[in-house]
Amino acid sequence: MSSLPRGFEPQTPEDLGQRSLAELREMLKRQERLLRNVKFICKLPDKGKKISDAVTKLKAAIAEREEVRGRSELFYPVSLDCKERQKAIAVVDGDRDKAQNSDQILDTSSPVPGCSSVANITSSQTTSRQQGLAHPTRGGDAEAAEAEHTVSEHPTSSSGAPAPSSSQASEGLPQHCALGQVEDHPGSSDNLFIDRLQRITIADPTEHHSEGNRNPENLAGLWSGPQKKPHYMEVLEMRAKNPMPPPHKFKTNVLPSQPRDSSSACQRRGSPISSEERRRRDRKHLDDITAARLLPLHHLPTQLLSIEESLALQRQQKQSYEEIQAKLAAQKLAERLNIKMQSYNPEGESSRKYREVRDEDDDQSSEDEF
């Protein structure tokens, strides 16, 4: 009985759930390698049934993992939007809690109407300003302007003027005490809280400008507004709209397409060029590509001949061809017969050694005759 090599044993379903996708693919590759080994499969008692079952389970697990990963990639932008919205809601909830604490400090007053003081109003106003600087929200500036106007009319003793009495302070703020008493009712606490949250704002002391009251829907727009898409989503959409052309295969002696396209476009836009100019450009293009020049023409270009001239040329070509064939035949025959064609001299070399001798008297007589 032959056992499986180490690392090729079929895995249990519990182990498959804990494996990563790369490990599952590696295991599938090993099991398929075992199945291809026919001799090894024949030696097994179950003839490779366990291995085939393991291959089926691995394929199912890999398909499930890929499907889950595809779904997660599809819903990844949605999860990002949900996370951003949750962050915005958490920020707004924190603003609500801080604003509620500031409203409680602002609305805290004694049951007797004459026990409120300007110092409490000033401290509550400072607290609300600090909270507004940390988390600015949208809203009107009506109640904050009233509190500032009241504090400016009754300056503190540190500026040099006497502080007003508690009765005068309570008379100067009747509306504030009434609002504090109305907020004690539990039924209208939520509505008043939303109203106060909308009214908290920051006013620049150097610039006195009034803003109109905002609608309650603007507060909900803080977390329900359109969220900006991630950068990679914009890149993918842009690439889907404008796909890149496939890279052309490199070929020798071929220039890139861009200069050729530009030159052809210029030729189309320009005036028609003559045949000589086109021939010169083609020759220059050929020289640029191959760095080779055409050989000069040894013959005239083709011409239209008459029938008589063509017959005369054919006869001349036939005669020259026959002469060449006769010379070749004679040369072959001489090679077969071992005949060497040499110059014939019957007298031999000895006749050239002797020179003709003339007498001096004969030379003188010839001169006298002249």
Curated annotation (Swiss-Prot):
* Gene Ontology BP term (one): maintenance of ER location
Q: What segments bear the compositional bias annotation Low complexity?
A: 155-170
What Pfam families does its record include? Answer: GCOM2 (PF15328)
Concerning InterPro entries, the annotation shows: GRINL1, Tuftelin_GRINL1A/MYZAP/CCD68
Q: One MF term from GO for this chain? A: transcription elongation factor activity
Q: Where is this region: Interaction with Pol II?
A: 228-299, 316-341
Post-translational modification note: Dephosphorylated at Ser-271 by the PNUTS-PP1 complex, promoting RNA polymerase II transcription pause-release.
Compositionally biased region (Basic and acidic residues)? 138-152, 205-214, 349-358
State if NAD is listed as a keyword: no
- A GO cellular component entry from the record: nuclear envelope
Residue ranges annotated as compositionally biased, kind Polar residues, are 101-131, 254-266
Phosphoserine: residues carrying this PTM: S271
Q: State the family it belongs to.
A: Belongs to the GRINL1 family.
**How does this polypeptide assemble, per the annotation?**
Component of the Pol II(G) complex, which contains the RNA polymerase II (Pol II) core complex subunits and POLR2M and appears to be an abundant form of Pol II.
Q: What protein am I looking at?
A: DNA-directed RNA polymerase II subunit GRINL1A
Q: Which organism is it from?
A: Bos taurus (Bovine)
